[in-house]
Swiss-Prot record:
Function comment: Serine protease inhibitor that inhibits trypsin at a molar ratio of 1:1.
Family membership: Belongs to the venom Kunitz-type family. 03 (sub-Kunitz) subfamily.
Record's GO cellular component terms: extracellular region
Cysteines engaged in disulfide bonds, as pairs: 37-85, 60-81
Site (Reactive bond for chymotrypsin): 47-48
All copies of domain BPTI/Kunitz inhibitor, residue ranges: 37-85
Residue span(s) of the pro-peptide: 28-33
Protein name: Kunitz-type U15-theraphotoxin-Hhn1g
Compartments where found: Secreted
Keyword field: Disulfide bond, Protease inhibitor, Secreted, Serine protease inhibitor, Signal
CDD domains hit by this protein: Kunitz_huwentoxin
Record flagged with keyword ATP-binding: no
Amino acid sequence: MGTARFLRAVLLLSVLLMVTFPALLSAEHHDGRVDICRLPSDSGDCLRFFEMWYFDGTACTKFVYGGYGGNDNRFPTEKACMKRCAKA
């Protein structure tokens, strides 16, 4: 039973890394700076509920932010998100 649980955890971690790592690589500029608008949505580590906005690659979308952690693809308003991330 313990081995199955461990293998399941390893599999889950592997899948998360396969999804997250390429997204982080593609968010990097040639000079090493990170384009925050290309980072994936990240609700953070806490359990509070703040309605925020992130850029999903084509539009600004609402999500619930936990209040701590996460990444910089997080904006207090749709307008702030669009101003930073929408390409004219």
